[in-house]
Regions:
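N-terminal DNA-binding recognition helix of tyrosine site-specific recombinases/integrases
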Residues: 1-17, 61-65
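DNA breakage-rejoining catalytic core of tyrosine-based enzymes
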Residues: 17-38, 98-99, 110-122, 132-135
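Basic, Lys/Arg- and aromatic-enriched nucleic-acid-binding interface segment
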Residues: 33-64, 156
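Alpha-helix N-cap/helix-start motif at helix boundaries, enriched for small hydrophobics
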Residues: 53-54, 65-70, 172
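Conserved tyrosine-mediated DNA breakage-rejoining catalytic core shared by Y-recombinases
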Residues: 69-121
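Short, basic (Lys/Arg/His-rich) helix/loop patches that form interaction surfaces
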Residues: 133-183
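Catalytic-site neighborhood detector that most strongly recognizes the C-terminal catalytic loop/helix
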Residues: 176-223
Length: 227
């Protein structure tokens, strides 16, 4: 049996029956580099352990949970095998002449993986100082809020915005383990690892220029992100 509605009835139905709404989940926010600099400066002088975590996050694009994991489980001399390329390697690989290291994290059985943690030599020294510490990430976030600092979750976002200015996006995705956006074959993995090693010093240079510099007043650029 078919039912026919008059135009008047159809119009009434459209008015009184709620329609299903779809909303694009884009949450723009402003991140001031001044806030990044002030946060790092405050932590450097008041909480060096959290300062080390923040540096890990901004230098490698790590999530707080992964930065905490790296600090707790830091085993630089351990030898591991990278599944994609069947290569045995020390967890910690340093390029002293280029001023950086990468540490194999190898967190994979998660929706939020973390393959490598790239960091400067200076951050490595901080990491060594606090290695083995078990930190509650909620405590870090509460500390940041209490002292008016940039929340930890924003450091990865700042890292991404700065990194893609000087590094090809595919390589930046590899460094930050954004594998949901990047499909890697066995051969390509080794290529990306090599490219990441070549490009990463450019990112550290950009960080030193915009973030680690003491000239806070010059770093007022705003970054809008929906990552």
């Amino acid at each position: 049996m078919s039912v026919t509605f008059t135009p008047e009835t159809f119009g009434w139905i459209m008015e009184v029956v709620p329609s299903r709404g779809y909303k694009l989940d884009v949450r723009p926010y402003q991140i001031s580099l001044d806030d990044v600099v002030k946060t790092l400066q405050y932590l450097k002088h008041h909480h060096e352990k959290y300062y080390a975590l923040y540096r890990l996050m901004i230098e490698g694009g790590l999530r707080l949970s992964h930065a905490v994991y790296v600090m707790k489980m830091f085993s630089p001399s351990e030898v591991v095998e990278i599944p994609e390329i069947y290569l045995e390697t020390p967890r910690l690989v340093c390029f002293s002449d280029k001023g950086f290291c990468r540490y194999y994290v190898g967190v994979r059985e998660s929706q939020k993986p973390c393959e490598w943690a790239y960091m400067s030599i200076e951050t490595l020294e901080l990491l060594k100082k606090f290695a083995g510490n078990n930190i509650d990430r909620r405590t870090v976030t509460r500390y940041a809020i209490r002292h008016g600092l940039l929340a930890p979750k924003y450091m990865r976002k700042v890292s991404w915005r700065l990194m893609v200015k000087v590094i090809p996006r595919e390589v930046a995705r590899f460094i930050q383990s954004r594998f949901g956006e990047l499909k890697i074959s066995e051969a390509r993995y080794e290529d990306l690892l090599s490219e990441a090693d070549n490009y990463y010093p450019k990112y550290l240079e950009k960080l030193r220029e915009l973030v680690y510099s003491s000239h806070v007043s010059e770093n007022s650029e705003q970054y809008t992100s929906s990552q």
